[in-house]
Amino acid sequence: MTFAKGILAALALAAAVGQASATELEHWPAPAARQLNALIEANANKGAYAVFDMDNTSYRYDLEESLLPYLEMKGVLTRDRLDPSLKLIPFKDQAGHKESLFSYYYRLCEIDDMVCYPWVAQVFSGFTLRELKGYVDELMAYGKPIPATYYDGDKLATLDVEPPRVFSGQRELYNKLMENGIEVYVISAAHEELVRMVAADPRYGYNAKPENVIGVTTLLKNRKTGELTTARKQIAEGKYDPKANLDLEVTPYLWTPATWMAGKQAAILTYIDRWKRPILVAGDTPDSDGYMLFNGTAENGVHLWVNRKAKYMEQINGMIKQHSAAQAKAGLPVTADRNWVIVTPEQIQ
């Protein structure tokens, strides 16, 4: 009897400790938290998974768009060290002013997002992962805006670029999902290695598995042997070791699928599952995240939207109507207008 009581006491203590350590969605509006908690309860420990965008979805602001001017400010990323293959158009130098790489990136975006999206991942070529990790950690700790210049037409303009700020709410959600046996994946339009430096580093609290971080991939080169590889290749071959990759150099040569627009949905099919769809997809950009939000989310899953711009909210509402009508016309279950959780950055900061 004493032994049985001891066992029961131990089990009760273990349960209490488990409850005490369980993550709660404290940085969420109450209705959103209830909907997310219900989703987690319904899918706990059943082999389900969730997919998150990173920039402006999992943290506030953009990693590459702030790392670029930060490294320019430090003088370590310059036009002179830019890979020749990335000099796509002439630089727009004016009397007394040499165009910044940040400005150059903006002008590439004016041509087409399909030009600047890969470029802003490729621009970090020539550095080792170890070097970039040091700079990413510096940026995350910087805590103040980074001055940058760009052209508004032919007029030189200035702006302050904010470094990423962790969304407390998303950090909670990542961990609560994983605590309940729901795998968390990141699919980002930023360079996979850069995003991994935040999402998989325990200091930032997301605790994503390194191999579950998926993004724009460029070949990595061993400077001593010339051998080429990528994390995605290593993961597929079952021999991925993030620490062993730290001294590999980032090259500008792109790997596919490219993880923006339809490529995000392609990444789910390529790297996660051909048939099982995520129970939650989170994003903030209609064009880049729209495919995985509408085509990727499971029938009873949640579309999680971070409403950071009024024009994007208007655009996503238009897409909801358009895709709902298209589903109905095709005789498919209408899911595009169901199960949306919409929050602002301020609500989950």
UniProtKB/Swiss-Prot annotation:
Reactions catalysed: phosphocholine + H2O = choline + phosphate; phosphoethanolamine + H2O = ethanolamine + phosphate
Cofactor dependence: Mg(2+)
PANTHER family per UniProt: PHOSPHATASE RV3661-RELATED, PHOSPHOSERINE PHOSPHATASE
Active site: D53 (nucleophile), D55 (proton donor)
Effect of C109A: Slight decrease in inhibition by tetramethylammonium chloride
Intracellular or extracellular location(s): Periplasm
EC annotation from Swiss-Prot or TrEMBL: 3.1.3.75
Organism encoding this protein: Pseudomonas aeruginosa (strain ATCC 15692 / DSM 22644 / CIP 104116 / JCM 14847 / LMG 12228 / 1C / PRS 101 / PAO1)
Signal peptide stretch: 1-22
Biophysicochemical property: pH dependence: Optimum pH is dependent on the substrate: optimum pH is 5-8 with phosphorylcholine, 6 with phosphorylethanolamine and 5 with pNPP.
UniProt name for this protein: Phosphorylcholine phosphatase
GO molecular function: hydrolase activity; metal ion binding
Induction and repression of expression: Induced in the presence of choline, betaine, glycine betaine or dimethylglycine. Induction is mediated by the transcriptional regulator GbdR. The nitrogen regulatory protein NtrC is necessary for full pchP expression. Expression is also partially dependent on the sigma-54 factor. Induced via GbdR in bovine lung surfactant and mouse BALF.
Cytoplasm recorded as keyword: no
